A protein has these predicted regions:
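Conserved N-terminal phosphate-binding loop of PLP-dependent enzymes in the Aspartate aminotransferase
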Residues: 1-457
């Protein structure tokens, strides 16, 4: 008997409605819209649902399926490891070879000075790990007042209590509040916060806002600044070139640790191995997940810089932190295979030199002068098309245009993501030019239909 029985789509949707709680979903709206789409298989850059529809996955699952669907190398790596050793912990002075090898390969690729790895299962866990290490570090350095964690509006750092607090998403804060000692500052989001100024001037102003917030909070109390190189789930917010050099100088001046959340940007998405490489960031920590296994199995890592690692190792004693699945051998084996494929197939370089520039050109040409498009922005294979709410009359609530357009995208056979009123593009790194053409064509068709519905021409 197969482990998953054959059922009609309607029956799957009924069981789903009866039993499954969906993340970031309004259950009443889901029911009113006819329930879930049941995705049954994937191949390359396409997924297929239980009704037989084929959709081009322009979001790589959830920003993670970098190598596309159906990679036999990853499936084989998981199977071989599950047969040899399906589980063992990294507690009690034990380890496994896949965890060691993946940690070694990671440290070969990460920015200089990051050479200690702690594994988890999700980006959220890696953020929590870093938070605990930061507080422990400052305690060991006899600066226990350094407890405040600074992040940015529209940031996304996971869904645990710490991650949701650090994130700059108001709907998440409304659900469970914000941890004491977490503060936020404006992001380098020129479309929303920019004035009549050059990108360079705006980047400096956004960076200066970080300094002003640190000074207002008291530098002797601020422990760390958390930031994504490019804010992905916040709407693909790409900072001006002047932003990151200034932010790093500010963090050094006030002795504030810098945490780069690479969960979306990592492993080639920006055209470099890490977003830190694209923006010349030298952080004290990075967090990774998602594409580390191309999404095939859950895995994350907190990669720790020498300064912090040295203190924790020399002064910290026994590390009172860990997860049952830290360094699980099967995901680590898939992670090793993923990194080797990224390198062997030159996908990082291809993103930087070929497919990334091609996607940019296609998007800019498709939406140049479009009456409903306010901005096209991005880097590598991470892009957004921001819809202009001001073009509609009457002015719709924020997010309404994005959701309307997203529904048309699904109808037209392409999976994207709407963040407020921005459509986000994050296809698998293996995408071909013809598939980029198809993705952009279907997105434009969806935006054109939205514009026609609201009378924008």
């Amino acid at each position: 008997m197969p482990p998953i029985p054959e059922r009609a789509s309607a029956e799957w949707r009924r069981f789903d409605a009866d039993h499954l709680i969906h993340p970031f979903t309004d259950p009443l709206a889901l029911a009113a819209g006819g329930g879930t789409r049941v995705v049954t298989r994937g191949e390359g850059v396409y997924v297929f649902d239980s009704d037989g529809n084929r959709l081009l996955d322009g979001l790589a699952g959830l920003w993670c399926v970098a190598l596309g669907y159906g990679r036999s190398e990853l499936i084989g790596a998981a199977e071989r490891q599950l047969r040899a050793l399906p589980y063992y912990s990294s507690f009690f002075h034990t380890t496994t070879t896949p965890a060691i090898e993946l940690a070694r390969l990671l440290c070969e690729r990460t920015p200089p000075g990051l050479d200690r790895v702690f594994f988890g299962c999700s980006g959220s866990e890696s953020i929590d790990t870093v938070v605990r290490m930061i507080w422990n570090y400052w305690d060991l350095e006899d600066q226990p007042r350094k407890r405040i964690l600074l992040s940015r509006e529209f940031a996304y750092h996971g869904s645990t209590v710490a991650g949701a607090s650090l994130g700059g998403m108001s709907n998440m804060h409304a659900m469970s509040g914000v941890l004491a000692g977490v503060a936020h500052v404006m992001p380098p989001y020129a479309y929303r916060y920019g004035r009549d100024e050059t990108p360079e001037a705006f980047g400096r102003r956004a960076a200066d806002a970080v300094e002003e917030r640190i000074l207002a909070l008291d530098p002797e109390r601020v422990a760390a600044f958390f930031a994504e190189p490019v804010q992905g789930a916040g709407g693909v917010i790409v900072p001006p070139e002047s932003y990151w050099p200034r932010v790093q100088e500010i963090c050094r001046r006030y002795d504030v640790l810098l945490v780069a959340d690479e969960v979306i940007c990592g492993f080639g998405r920006t055209g470099q191995w890490f977003g830190c490489d694209a923006f010349e960031i030298r952080p004290d920590f990075i967090t990774v997940a998602k594409a580390i296994t191309s999404g095939y199995l859950p895995l994350s890592a907190a990669v720790v810089g020498e300064r912090v690692a040295r203190t924790l190792e020399r002064k910290g004693g026994r590390l009172a932190h860990g997860y049952t699945y830290s360094g699980h051998p099967a995901p680590c084996a898939v992670g090793v295979a993923t990194l080797r494929i990224l390198a062997a197939e030159g996908l990082v370089e291809r993103t930087r030199e070929e497919t990334g520039p091609y996607l940019e050109r296609c998007l800019r040409e498709a939406f140049a002068g479009h009456p409903l498009v306010g901005e096209v922005r991005g880097v590598g294979l991470l892009w957004a098309v921001e819809l202009d709410r001001d073009a509609a009359s009457p002015l719709p609530p924020e997010g309404e245009l994005g959701l309307r357009c997203l529904a048309h995208c699904f109808d037209n056979g392409v999976v994207l993501r709407a963040v407020r009123d921005a459509l986000c593009f994050c296809p698998p790194l293996v995408i071909r030019r013809s598939e980029i053409d198809e993705m952009v064509e279907k997105a434009k068709k969806s935006i054109d239909r939205t514009a026609a519905e609201i009378g924008v021409a």
